[in-house]
Every structure is written in structure tokens, then in C-alpha cells.
Design a protein with these regions (language model features):
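Structural/interface elements that position substrates and couple domains in central-metabolism enzymes
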Residues: 1-167
């Protein structure tokens, strides 16, 4: 959940309280699709660096510099949230297309034609428009539930994410 890296840092600092060791904890989420981890690593769209330290941010930027990718430098909590927001948005697209597919069956429209027509809209894109039995993988189910849980912990209700989980 959001705030995990804060807890990790505190745990390490408590453990090292009497040692003269300097640590920096950063969040560096991955954005890999199931079955294409190597490709996704080598052809990433961006690198997200979440840190509370300019020193750690600079070190990670130097590590990633040879890849010539956009680097998004944010706080640790924002980096953790970016991961959830991305995965949950993709789950939303899948759930949406499944709902549209159900309606297409009722009205006699072809979901493949609908998806193809939608895919040319640059605001939508062609990814994640395939209707099916729902979203899966190792991240989407746990991340949608996690974001729903996080929102409730903070007294917020994410109706869209709750609908994605329900669909």
C-alpha cells in the first residue's frame, strides 16, 4: 500500500539505530506485463523514481541515464500511487470493454468492430480494448483491491474502482 516505503525506511532506521550507516529508501516501481517482462524492461515507456532525498534521486537518475527514457521523479508515496493508478486504469479499460461487449450482444453490434473503431481515437489508443472474461494477471486483481482498501483507510470511496472490482 501507499506508505510502505515509509515503513520500510523506519524499520531499517530502527534496526540500525546504533550503527553509523546512512541509508536512502526509494520507490522504483516496475510496469511489466505478464509474459513480457524482459521486453517491457528493455522498452519501458518511463522510469518512475520516488524518493524523499535529492541524493537518492540523483543516484537513480544516473543509473537509468543510459536508457534515455523519460524519468518521472516524485515522492515515494506518489511513486507507489502511480503504480496503482496505472494498473487500475488498465483494469478499468478491460472492464469497460467487457461491459460494452455485453451490450453489443444485446443490440446486435460486433465488439471487434467497436474496439477497432475506438482504437483510432488517440485519446483512447488501441491497448486493452479486447473484451474477454475479465482482467487477470498477477497485478490487476490485487492492485484494484489494494487501491479500494487504501481509499477506505483514508475515508474515501473510489466508486469507479469499486465498479471495476465488481465487474
Amino acid at each position: 500500500p501507499v506508505g510502505t516505503n515509509d515503513k520500510v525506511e523506519q524499520f531499517i532506521r530502527d534496526f540500525l539505530v546504533h550503527k553509523e550507516v546512512k541509508i536512502e529508501v526509494a520507490s522504483n516501481p516496475e510496469f511489466l506485463a505478464q509474459g513480457s517482462a524482459v521486453h517491457d524492461t528493455l522498452h519501458a515507456a518511463r522510469i518512475v523514481i520516488g524518493t524523499e532525498s535529492r541524493h537518492a534521486e540523483k543516484m537513480l537518475q544516473e543509473i537509468y541515464e543510459p536508457f534515455k527514457l523519460p524519468v518521472v521523479s516524485v515522492s515515494r508515496r506518489s511513486a507507489e500511487m502511480i503504480k496503482y493508478a496505472c494498473n487500475d486504469f488498465l483494469a478499468l479499460k478491460i472492464s469497460y470493454m467487457n461491459e460494452i461487449a455485453n451490450l453489443c450482444e444485446l443490440v446486435g453490434a460486433d465488439i471487434e468492430d467497436i474496439a477497432r473503431g475506438m482504437s483510432y481515437d488517440t485519446r483512447i489508443g488501441s491497448n486493452f480494448l479486447k473484451a474477454g472474461i475479465g482482467y487477470g494477471g498477477s497485478c490487476f486483481p490485487k492492485d484494484t483491491k489494494a487501491l479500494k482498501f487504501i481509499a477506505r483507510q483514508y475515508g474515501s470511496q473510489l466508486k469507479t474502482i469499486e465498479a471495476v472490482v465488481d465487474v
